[in-house]
From Swiss-Prot:
Keywords for the protein's UniProt record, in alphabetical order: Cell wall biogenesis/degradation, Coiled coil, Glycosyltransferase, Membrane, Signal-anchor, Transferase, Transmembrane, Transmembrane helix
Composition bias, Acidic residues: 751-781
Entry similarity comment: Belongs to the BMT family.
Induction note: Expression in regulated by TSA1 and repressed in rat catheter biofilm.
Signal peptide: none
Effect of inactivating the gene: Impairs the elongation of beta-mannose chains on the acid-labile fraction of cell wall phosphopeptidomannan.
Protein name, entry field: Beta-mannosyltransferase 4
Amino acid sequence: MTKSYMPLFRSPRQFKKIYFILIPLILAVIILHVFFDGFNKISEYSPTFISNRILNHQDQQQKSEKSSDVISSYFPSLAIYPKNFDNRVEFVNEPKNSKWIQYFGDSKTVLSNYITNQTYTNHSIGLYSSSTVRPPASSCKDILYERSFEITKYRTLHDDLYKLATTLLYQLENDPAFQDLSPFFNDRLPHIIMRGELHKHIYKFAGTSVWLEQHGVHLMLSRVIYSQQGKKNDPQLSLLYAQVYDENWNELNDIELIVPVINPNGERVYDSVKYPQFLAIPFYHNSEYIKSRWYGPEDTRLILTKNKFGDDEPVIIFNSYHRQIKDMSTEDDNNVHTKFEFYRSMFVGWLFQYQLGKLNTDGIQDSKFNNVTFNKVKELRIEGKERTSIEKNWTPFIDPDERNQISYYGNHNLGDNYVYIVYQWNHLKILKCELDNFIDSSHSTCTMFFKDVETTQEVGPVRGGTELWPIKIDNNNNNNNLNEDDLSTKQEPQQQRQLWIGFLRAHVKDCGCGGSMYRPNFLILEKLNSKFKLTYLSGSINFNVSVYGWANYDVVCAGHEANALIPNGISMFDQDDDYLTLSMSVADQDNTLVHIHGVKKLIYSLDHDWNGILKENKQIECVVNNANDFCKAYADEHYKLGDSEAAIKEVKQKAKEEAEKAKAEKEKAEKEKAEKEKAEKEKEEKEKEEKEEKEKAEKEKEEKEKAEKELAEKELAEQKDEDAKDEDKNEDEDDKEKNDESGLTEKSEVEENGENTNEGGEDDGDGDGEEEKEDDDDIEV
């Protein structure tokens, strides 16, 4: 059964009304697209790219419900061609995404309305000068300049750990450069993903980025560490994760950049590179030995250079654990025995240049990597110096005065041939390292280009930090401040002074907050002829960023942990409008951005009158003192807020003491109650016993009295009986005596009257017998 047809417009009038709305809307979108959108379809750039695929895409766009929303239609799957795309260059891997566009925006695109329209607040900093023109400073206050710039509220970039983990899992299974890393994960990664425990094993931080002007995007590299045991301070593997962001710092997922790369043969070709992805940085590793070994690139700094073809070349400076051959010997069994030494050394790497194998990191070439493509890296070796066990915290920068104009088709090698590196900030030491035309192809040779004074002092607490960004200012040094002793070093006036700005990190230990503290320090480095000077260095800056605990998010200044806010890179610096974006990390666990307005204004507000003379100064000492004071103040503040370990311990101790006190009081009360109850019970029992005893005694008394009474009565009765008996006896005796007396009388009478008695014997005898019988009866009774 078919449905009846229902027309879209029921009348021509409705059709016209719709057109009156649609036509202006479409025209407005086209105008906005042309004037404000830096992206255009690649088919509009070159007719050679008009293909069935592009036409199909355009056909689909015409049918799409979002055909008027041109910008959003580019995403999520997209391939971006550079605005200087050269179709004469060979293409090795064409993009897999169905949507192709080319970027035509200008260099100002990096400063978007998103950045300029944010709310900025004043932020004060103190800078310590190393000026030798001013009178010798007796205290830190004498060289302190109070200045300020404006900052936005910090923004923490979202970490999609699921996307990161699935990308890693795909590369472990499919990318030859990563397959050998699989044993580190022991097939646990899928289970970790399923259980939702990625945050326990994977940490992403130390993000640093560059703006790719030819593509109109930020390319950010972050360090990703993996811990088998789920402990952030005990990782086994460190990798580099590359992501692409637009000018508003929105991540562009599953995007391809068409970039000019230099293949292992040294040829310039176009390649399609998909992001996000983990970079195939070669490094030595052994999954069977993981104790006290952290494999992979660390402390990566990203800097944009120009290669010999004139292309923007993202270059990384990092340190990595590697091995090198120390000794090789042949034993009696004719087997070659190799002894290795292990180092943590500095390397330079190229994001768009490649190599086969990893001989330069493993010490020997393993045949299984012979045909595996890695990013090109070279160890940075200081000329005339043996390798040390650990090298780290180098600060890179490019000198634009040495950057020549590029002429690729003229076959000129005129790119950035060198990168400068600040090797040490206290007693300044600067290296100059090769980026091309290597003296020794196995490494990049670094020469000690400048050193303040000869010293064996180790790297101090001020170190590392971001890459340095060049800036030129008008010269205000007229040499009027030179004294007679300095005439021999008098310099000719320059039209402009070459400066570099950046952010170091002061690392102070045992300062009152946990084990140590890291905070950014703004710096200004100056070059005069071939001499360098750290002219200004600020005290610790917090940028109003909340620094949470290293292990426990809610507890700061804990144990031996670091309280860390570390500057990673300058993402952009628009000098015309004076905006700068700084990337930082908190507690080695995230990437945070702060936009700054007024850095250039701050620089121009300072004196720049260095005449090339180098003298001792208190600058570094003052900065370190400031860092220690900052640390103590921070610890005191968070002690008052109650989220420091000391405050929490005190609260817990007080709570424990109060609990113990309450327990003791409770026990005391219970004891007193028990004792009272016991006493009352004992009293009751005693009273009861006394009562019972009393009653018993009374009863016994009564019974005794009764018995005594009865006994007395009995005795009385008996006495009475006895008395009666005695009385009777006495009476009987009296009677007897009487009788005896009567008898004697009678006898005498008889004797006297013997004859009378004998004559009347029967009658008298009978009578006398009856009287005796009666007497006997009376006695018996």
